[in-house]
């Protein structure tokens, strides 16, 4: 039996809500978390596609490095510091971006994220919960809250427009020892589905990216146990997907009007197995829990 595409599993809504023309070529784009990893890869690829890119990151030096990389390659780019967990920062990002573009953005990518894991529920420090949810969930909430009205109000000449929210296969995988991260990404998935429904019939497309392991620095910069960090590093090497490839696949999916983007085979398999055989999936995850958690 062939694997089902995410839109087929959940019905035709994924495509019906999003059908439009290309958004990622020549975009006026705002990318959060653009200082490294998938965010930097998004910025570089958008620059290659002729876009002007606002590279935003809480690490201002990293944001400037990405922007400099783009300008060296002939693209237009600027760096702006932004802590996405703070709505005032996101409002300032929107204001500065529009001033630099001299127009409303045509594409917003809510990518900034952090990682935490390695302990079961009840042992994860509440400060870690607040930190992860503050960046991973409240960041996209702030981004959608601030930028959606701006995209709605943009002139028709600026259509099509789009929002890409970066979630993770953790949104549906329920991997043990990663509760805070899982919950944050499940929230981003639901946020994206709701936003797509609300924007149905407009020129604004929504795509949610749900990758598995990608070669980024999220393990080094996160609050993750030594055992879990070693496992994650091994899986990142095994997946074979670079951040650049994930960014390209996601931007192409967005141009097609796909609501869901699961770039890797293991993400697609996990998506399908959980929906076609949820009991089997949960038992398998339980076995993994007994072998990976202390």
Give residue ranges: language-model regions:
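The beta1-alpha1 cofactor-binding region of Rossmann-like NAD(H)/NADP(H)-dependent oxidoreductases
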Residues: 60-61, 81-92, 126
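Conserved glycine-rich Rossmann-like NAD(P)H-binding loop of the short-chain dehydrogenase/reductase
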Residues: 51-65
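Residue(s) in the substrate-gating loop at a strand-loop-helix junction
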Residues: 168
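Active-site helix of classical SDR
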Residues: 144, 184
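Conserved glycine-rich cofactor-binding loop
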Residues: 28, 35-36
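SDR active-site lid
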Residues: 201-265
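Substrate-binding pocket helix/loop in short-chain dehydrogenase/reductase
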Residues: 119-121, 125-130
